[in-house]
Amino acid sequence: MLPTLKKSGRPRDARGRFIRHHERLPVSLADTRGALFVASEMADFIKAGGLGDVAAALPRALRHRYDVRVLIPGYRAVLERAGKVEIVGRVLAHAALPACDIGRIVQSDGLPIYILLSKELFERDGSPYVSTSGSEFEDNAIRFATLSHAAAQIAAGHAGLGWKPRLLHLNDWPCALAAGYVRWSGGTTPCLLTIHNLAYQGLVPYSMAAALGIPAERVAELEFYGQMSFLRGGIVNADHVNTVSVSYAKQITGPAQGCGLDRLLAGRAAKGALTGIVNGIDASWDPRTDEYLDSHFSVNQWQGRQANAAQVRKAFGLRESTGPLFAVVSRLVHQKGLDLICEVAPQIVAAGGQIAVIGGGEPEIERQVAELTRRYPGQVGAFIGFEEGLARRMFAGADFLLMPSRFEPCGLSQMYAQRFGCLPIAHATGGLIDTVDDGVTGFLFQHASVEALRRCLERAFRTFRLPSLLSAMRRAAMLRPSGWDVAGKKYLSLYEHTAATAPALATVS
């Protein structure tokens, strides 16, 4: 049984940890402007990726200027943590999309959350998107079209809530079709679509168009190489599209990272309707107070890092060492460049370094990592899986974070590492370009190749042997602004821009 969210006290995330947002400003809704933030996951209740963290943090960062409310599906984990849910509205059936009640809870910090209730669609085991066996739910198209349609109905004032948003903020493919449902019904509510990862597009066969309630004359808006793409439909119909970093917004307009949508996105960019905003990270990532650390430290007091490094070495079965400790906190998949790490591991060990790996993913890469631990006992250690406290201690104790991702829309690990004084060694792509200042707050290499990574590692080893330079870089990394207050201000401006430049504003009640 998963824990129930308490009615009082600070809100907790899906793992039961306190959500702490030191940058959250006092809530004043005298100048109220409504925004509905629609997401398929939220770390308060359930999380499958970085979107869950954003959905928990960004609405809270905006509430001093907007009446932001969140809409999420009523997964089993959500209902178990939500406590008592008040039924406040209902959306009607549409084509094959079932009617659903809308529940409402208010988090202890005052954030209102609407929950789309459907036992048939959402109350099941597994993650938001896949079953316990790891396969996608066969009815995902119906599930998330229902979420999208509900958002459009709320925007139109047809859900009985007594409230209409001035703007819809949609996130990734599961919510993208809401922009289409708004437009296809003649609605004018401004829609902002945030793309967290363009690689996931919500592809479904054309044969489902009628079941999803897509007008026959608008099906072409979703066309993607013989299928329909929820994400493409959102990009076409949203008033503005943004991504989670400035560099990623530029990269997806080209064929290398455009995932087949580059021409469409380039067209939106040419009209000023595609921008990028780097994500923030939660205030709980603070080495002075982190609840998972036994030894705290700060930019002016480093001793705690040594104690954390010793804990990490012990946890991973590594020998005591005065050499650099390299951390890998990642899904073990090709996209994250884990094959490159496996190739350079012998060089790291030969130069006196050690490697600690935490994560899970593709069986072949897991096998390669396991082989490295057998080949270099005491120098390479791995934990296949994930454990939050251990990951945080790795950031707090390691000298360098290996992050050679082939593409990275934003990335959070590099910012977590920087906050804890662990210097990222990263491929210059997407959000890594925007968050790692080469030679100042970490190290970047330009090509996702073994040779480029090797040369970057040589720079890192040279820096490690210069204590004054290493300390200066750690300090710069720890002091880099990365909280949600920075991103929140940019989203507030984007909300205003989207509302002001939409062809016609909805009548706000």
From Swiss-Prot:
GO terms for biological process: glycogen biosynthetic process. Pathway: Glycan biosynthesis; glycogen biosynthesis. ADP-alpha-D-glucose binds at residue 47. Its EC number is 2.4.1.21. Keywords: Glycogen biosynthesis, Glycosyltransferase, Transferase. One of its GO terms (molecular function) is alpha-1,4-glucan glucosyltransferase (UDP-glucose donor) activity. It catalyses: [(1->4)-alpha-D-glucosyl](n) + ADP-alpha-D-glucose = [(1->4)-alpha-D-glucosyl](n+1) + ADP + H(+). InterPro entries: Glyco_trans_1, GS/SS, Starch_synth_cat_dom. Synthesizes alpha-1,4-glucan chains using ADP-glucose. HAMAP family: Glycogen_synth (MF_00484). This is Glycogen synthase.
